[in-house]
Amino acid sequence: RSTGSRGVKSMKEVGYYNGTIGPLSEISCPILDRAVYFGDGCYDATYVQNGVIFALEDHFDRFYNSCRLLRIPFQYSREELEKILYSLVEAYDGNDGKGILYWQTSRGTALRNHLFPDETEVKPNLMAFLMPMDLSPKEKEFHTITLEDTRFLHCNIKTLNLIPSVIANQKAKEAGCQEVIFHRGDRVTEMAHSNVSFLIDGTLVYHPFDNKVLPGIAIKHLIKTAEKLGVPTRAEEITVTEAMNADELIITSSGTLCNRITEVDKIPVGGKADELFHKLQDAAWDEFMVYTKQK
């Protein structure tokens, strides 16, 4: 099937690979895609609701920057990629139109060799899918564990290499929790697949956007929201102890716009800046509803 969704039967889960669109279970990639044996690629993901891809330009900024940092010569313009992604949205008929849209590129399909393939002969591959997922409801509270951050030092690139996060999430599940707060030494970095921020004495505190954390779109939106509301913000590395003593601990991601963390390593945390937290949370949701043309 072509990238155009006209004539494509509405699907509960939609997949795409290099120009072919169809039911996700029927889409496959070659065994020699460099994503398979090297994880040689990058990705991005965001939420879809009401036929709108949320914060797409922000996600494109991050995706194209990841391609640049990995030296992947991604061949599609932003306009072309947007058209491809919206073809999935138009073909999607699952979960009342709500879902998570994921796309990734790899350095192409070639025999296994650590060296980059010849760019004149091998083009990057593009894979995408849209599947049902609900946003975390506003009232959901998260329980987490803490773990030493053993990831490499390119966390600002949204690469396909996520084994430390996979292992960490499994450990969280086995501990009866939903997420992990990483730390390097005694300094908090981020979470396995989310950002963490803090309300401390009326200020929104977050980790500086350096190579130790992913520049999360949701946290960036929350920072802008705080500034609009006159809430001070500060980029600062804080210790695990300072995090545990924060007035509020906040989790943000593409699937969790702004939620509370209420327990870390089975110890109750936060809950000391209720009014300010809900002010930020309500504003984050209002922005989402307006952007997706529901308000």
Please place each PLM-identified region on the residue numbering.
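Helix-start/capping segments and mature chain N-termini
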Residues: 7-90, 115-295
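Short secondary-structure capping/junction motifs at helix and strand boundaries
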Residues: 90-102, 139
